A protein has these predicted regions:
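Intrinsically disordered, low-complexity regions
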Residues: 7, 135, 261, 489, ...
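Compact, charge-rich alpha-helical regulatory domains located at protein termini
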Residues: 693-766
């Protein structure tokens, strides 16, 4: 398409219509102009039939009852559960699907969500997941794959969509989330980074007004989005208002930050129904696409007529959308993509992600792995079958699933696997208990407790243990985010967290249980001992107002500053082997901090370790977290071997955001670098010295009276200069008593010309 020619032929009305969704998940087709339809779809875990079928095949669904249509959507690959009439609808839809999928007859894949990808700490694994997601989207003619990724910080563990995000830490977010973008974009499909910004709750999500400090936005909530802005084609605005302004109508977010500060040149689409004000206000703010359709263009035309929206601004938005359509609306499947390759590519990516992200959290007396010939009894009504995905936009209906119990039967023998067999447990069989918690978009969890069923099972097994049962208890956490164990940690022997592991989760879990795979996942989020310990506990809203009262102290930052011990800390994950960080050295070169670390595998099994380096500012002039993740690496080390690991990060990463100055500032002085296998397991430290600070922080006229009072030589020099100038020292005494944070220049504007004072300040900085 010659977009410049097409654009010049478009009327103002057509440009307005171009911005407005035509259906729930597509933009309007203009046949006479040669503009094709652009399809959107969720998402980050695979193809969502609940969105796809009504958007593409509503004419078929209308011939059946809503219940029949819903059954076909959710049971498309469970035909034995369908009535004859529902099977008829299924066949009609399958026929339509075959016309776009060609020789791809397999079901869509279900991939792990962000929280499990975050637990991999492996950028390459996340990238390969993005490639598989992009391949799937091509097969369904999806031009923009929504939620690739969801970068919202894991702030509130009860959030119904917590599982979609990657981490509570901005650095881990910033390294991993862009890799989904890269993978999807490499296939030609447009990735979509959402929800910008602070979509951290489901309660009152449409219309809630969140008060968030600028420092918290800049240091915690923006970095993941900023990293994605360099590689993603589209952004999605969020539901909440931030500091009084709707995210979809915020010029600060969508223009000043996203475009002016970060240089984003792509297209912004609203979250579905997020634009609750005037469409023209959102266009002026920097938003281009309005969903879902059919979206009314009338208000845009009225704004053009009354002058509240300029034709130039409309042109800017329409051209951005037209360019996106030209690039992504007419994508074709690769000609060499066979059904077998489609399955193999997806299965491999999903398996690697699950294998890399599943976390071993407890392993008392080496209870795991389960040895060949052992007996296993699986307890619970779900019979060990995993929930692969969360509810809402992230749900995927497929028959490409794997089963942990069935795989264990293959590995250990069918005769060694039983269900709910307490007698076998008495005789020494492993008791495997799966705790599954369902979570979904639209509502938050009520608490962080395990289900009553699981607590009762563990209670019964614990009682049997006290009465002489010889078996070991393994608890599997099939969860959307943190849970509290309420004392179960004293009963169980092994604990594995699989989150929602995707379609290959059953296989990956069985491989880890039996030692075919050495677990290497590390938690991307802190697990509290009690919900009341969480940093955001007191800020959970009961209205349409929410204050992020914890500020920058999100996740492990909040636990450390309050000296609260969590159940499992950020970055924590065990292995079937053991590792020792034996040395760390660091130097500052050309604006980079270069680190060399030596890590050894001191066990008898090859495995992967996640080495993490945190920084701690020694003697800071502002309140800062106790430690902040700066860099990390996941490395494989053979048993009995050691490996040199090179890591680095920018000196600018050490900056903090000053609300007084409206910018990031760098403190000079000493920073301790802490290397460990989690945020709490610090093995080695070293110190670097940053020799130059930001001009705004140089000791001198802009320093507070309080800080000056703590520098005796500087204070004496000031007194002498004031005496020579015939000025009183009394203003300093008064300031120190009542407003000690005032800058010295506020009370002595001429101090910049005081030679003794300025020389003493320079010497103080050097010393």
């Amino acid at each position: 398409m010659d977009i410049d020619r097409v654009f010049s032929d478009m009327t103002v009305l057509e440009k307005a219509q171009l911005l407005c969704g035509a259906s729930s998940f597509s933009l309007r087709e203009f046949k006479e102009l040669g503009i094709p339809r652009l399809n959107f779809l969720d998402g980050g875990t695979g193809i969502n039939f609940e969105q796809l079928f009504p958007d593409r095949y509503q004419d078929l669904l209308d011939e059946y009852t809503p219940e029949e249509a819903d059954h076909v959507i959710t049971r498309f690959y469970k035909q034995d559960l369908l009535t004859d009439k529902e099977k008829e609808l299924r066949e009609r839809i399958a026929d339509r699907l075959s016309k776009i999928k060609g020789n791809i007859t397999a079901a869509p894949g279900c991939y792990p969500p962000g929280i499990l990808l975050g637990a991999t700490w492996n950028p390459d694994t996340v990238y390969k997941t993005g490639l598989a997601l992009g391949m799937e989207a091509l097969c369904y003619r999806v031009g923009v794959l929504l939620g690739t990724p969801n970068v919202n910080v894991l702030r509130e563990p009860r959030c119904g969509r917590l599982f979609e995000g990657y981490s509570e830490d901005p650095k881990l977010n910033s390294v991993l989330a862009p890799e989904i973008c890269r993978g999807v974009e490499e296939t030609g499909v447009a990735s979509n980074t959402k929800h910008f910004v602070c979509n951290n709750l489901e309660i009152n999500r449409v219309g809630i007004d969140e008060t968030v400090s600028m420092r918290a936005l800049r240091e915690i909530y923006f970095p993941g989005f900023k990293a994605c802005s360099k590689v993603t084609r589209t952004f999605m605005s969020a539901y909440p208002s931030i500091n009084g302004t709707s995210s979809s109508e915020s010029r600060f977010l969508l223009t000043e930050v996203l475009r002016d500060d970060w240089g984003f040149e792509g297209t912004v689409v609203t979250d579905w129904g997020a634009c609750t004000g005037k469409t023209s206000d959102a266009i002026n703010a920097g938003c281009q696409i309005y969903m879902p359709g059919p979206w009314d263009h009338t208000e845009i035309m009225e704004a053009i007529q009354n002058g509240s929206l300029s034709t130039e601004k409309l042109d800017e938005a329409a051209y951005s959308v037209l360019k996106l359509i030209d690039e992504r609306a007419s994508l074709e499947m690769p000609s060499d993509l066979t059904n077998d390759r489609y399955i193999e590519t997806g299965d491999r990516a999903a398996y690697e992600a699950a294998k890399e992200g599943i976390c071993l959290l407890m392993n008392k007396e080496d209870a795991l792995p389960i040895k060949q010939g052992s007996k296993v009894s699986i307890f619970g009504d779900n019979r060990g079958e995993l929930q692969d995905f969360g509810g809402g936009s992230a749900q995927v209906f497929t028959d490409r699933t794997t089963s942990m119990p069935e795989t264990l039967k293959t590995y250990l023998g069918s005769g060694n696997i039983s269900y709910n067999d307490i007698d076998a447990f008495y005789e020494g069989a492993y008791a495997v208990v799966t705790e599954t918690i369902l979570s979904r978009e639209g509502q938050d969890r009520e608490d962080l407790n395990m289900t009553r069923e699981t607590r009762d099972i563990l209670g019964s097994l614990g009682k049997a243990r006290s009465m002489g049962a010889k078996g070991r208890i393994i608890l599997i956490l099939n969860i959307p985010g943190p849970v509290t164990l309420d004392g179960a940690e004293d009963i169980i022997d092994g604990l594995i967290c699989v989150f929602y592991p995707g379609m290959m989760g059953g296989l990956a879990l069985a491989d880890i249980l039996t030692g075919r795979v050495n677990p290497s996942g590390a938690l991307p989020v802190t697990f509290p001992a009690r919900y009341e310990d969480t940093p955001a506990f007191l800020s959970y809203p009961d209205s349409f107002k929410c204050t992020y009262g914890e500020g920058i102290f999100v996740g492990y930052r909040g636990y450390q500053i309050r000296k609260i011990k969590p159940l499992f800390c950020f970055g924590y994950g065990l292995s079937y082997t053991s590792f020792d960080i034996r040395d760390i050295k660091a130097s500052v070169n050309n604006g980079r901090v270069d680190i060399k670390a030596c890590i050894a595998n001191t066990g008898d099994m090859g495995g992967k370790a996640v080495i993490q380096v945190y920084s701690h500012k020694l003697s800071s002039m502002v309140r800062r977290p106790e430690s902040e993740l700066r860099t990390f690496a996941k490395v494989y080390i053979e048993a009995g071997c050691e490996q040199q690991v090179d890591l680095s990060f920018d000196v600018t990463d050490l900056m903090y955001y000053s609300e007084d100055h409206g910018k990031f500032l760098l403190e000079d002085g000493k920073y301790e670098l802490r290397a460990g296998l989690s945020s709490e397991d610090i093995a080695r430290t070293c110190v670097i010295d940053i020799g130059e600070c930001s001009p705004e922080l140089r000791f001198g006229p802009d320093t507070s009276c309080l800080e000056i009072s703590r520098a005796p030589l500087v204070l004496e020099a000031l007194k002498q200069d004031l005496e020579d100038a015939g000025q009183s020292f009394q203003p300093f005494i008064t300031c120190l008593r009542y407003t000690p944070q005032d800058k010295i220049a506020v009370h002595f504007p001429e101090c910049r010309s005081y030679k003794r004072f300025m020389d003493a300040c320079a010497k103080h900085r050097r010393d």
